[in-house]
Amino acid sequence: MRGWLAVRLAGLDVTEVVVAPSPEGRVLSDPTVSPSGLVPYLEHRGARVWDSLAIVEYCAELAPALWPADRVARAQARAIAAEMHSGLRGLRLAMPMNLGGAFAGRGRTPEALADIARVEAVWADTRARYGAGGPYLFGAAFGAADAMYAPVVARFLTWAPEISAASRAYVDAVRAHPLVDAWYRAALAEPEAWRIARFEVAA
């Protein structure tokens, strides 16, 4: 989701290849599809880029407006994007991504709740310092940091943890973005056979 959003935000001319997950939930069974054997993976004008954050940075080289123009704001954006990319393990494990699921009240492990509190603190701090003028983390433009947090937004929508009104407003703004909506529509149109049983039942 994150890499795809960055590619579309940057306006790159690419052909999408959708890889079906295995029944165990692994997204790739053919390591020749990408150097890491994982998705997302981008080939563009001779560049081969894997890992979602690397794809975001590559896209930002071609479309610098994906990051804030101000140096200090840009540092904040990169820091919070990297924190999301490398952390939030408790949230990921307890509340896996399932765009068609509805598991309100489930998955609230202590680790997940701690991660949710941290996400809310990051959002509140970033919006207070840089979010004037629009509904996104850095104001009016949906940028790289918002793309990186889109999977967190998806989890909040599926698992419905208790969050503040300000966080809910941000969640709603991200969900309403045309590219995020396009991702949801594509996901919900995937074949029934692609559903992974262990992600269809809440713990």
Show which residues each predicted segment covers.
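Acidic/histidine-enriched, glycine/proline-rich intrinsically disordered or flexible terminal extensions
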Residues: A187-A203
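GST-like fold's C-terminal all-alpha helical module
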Residues: L88-A176
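A short structural micro-motif
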Residues: M84, H177, E190-W194
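GST-like domain detector, emphasizing the conserved glutathione-binding G-site
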Residues: M1-P110, A114, V122
